[in-house]
């Protein structure tokens, strides 16, 4: 599967009356665990890269990491930049 948009995942969740977990990623191990668990449970997941993660992992690396996990998963994976502090982060 490819990266899913937050809008499509939340619309589906609202329509079918379920919540979607938004999980803060601190590194590769967390992200992989969240993606694998979402696939095992057959649910979507929102991977959130917050300031702590971005302090140690450059955005281009995070982007490739999230994209790789989404492509390997049969579950929808949303990539979310959590708490962008300035336009430079966008």
Q: Language-model features: where?
A:
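Conserved small/polar residues in nucleotide/adenosyl-binding loops
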Residues: 88-90
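N-terminal amphipathic alpha-helix/helix-capping segment at the start of soluble metabolic enzymes
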Residues: 1-20
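Generic hydrophobic/packing signal
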Residues: 70-73, 81-85
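Glycine-/small-residue-rich active-site loops that bind phosphorylated ligands and cofactors
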Residues: 54, 85-86
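Glycine-rich, positively charged N-terminal anion/phosphate-binding segment
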Residues: 6-7, 28-74
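N-terminal basic/disordered segments at the start of proteins
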Residues: 2-3, 24-28
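Hydrophobic faces of well-ordered beta-strands that scaffold small-molecule active sites
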Residues: 19-24, 45-48, 77-83
């Amino acid at each position: 599967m490819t990266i899913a948009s937050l809008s499509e995942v939340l619309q589906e969740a609202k329509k079918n009356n379920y919540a979607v977990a938004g999980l803060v990623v601190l590194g590769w191990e967390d992200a992989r665990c969240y993606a694998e668990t979402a696939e095992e449970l057959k649910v979507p997941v929102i991977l959130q890269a917050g300031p702590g993660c971005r302090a140690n992992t450059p955005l281009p690396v995070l982007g490739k990491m999230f994209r790789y996990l989404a492509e390997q998963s049969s579950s929808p994976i949303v990539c979310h930049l959590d708490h962008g502090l300035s336009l430079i982060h966008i």
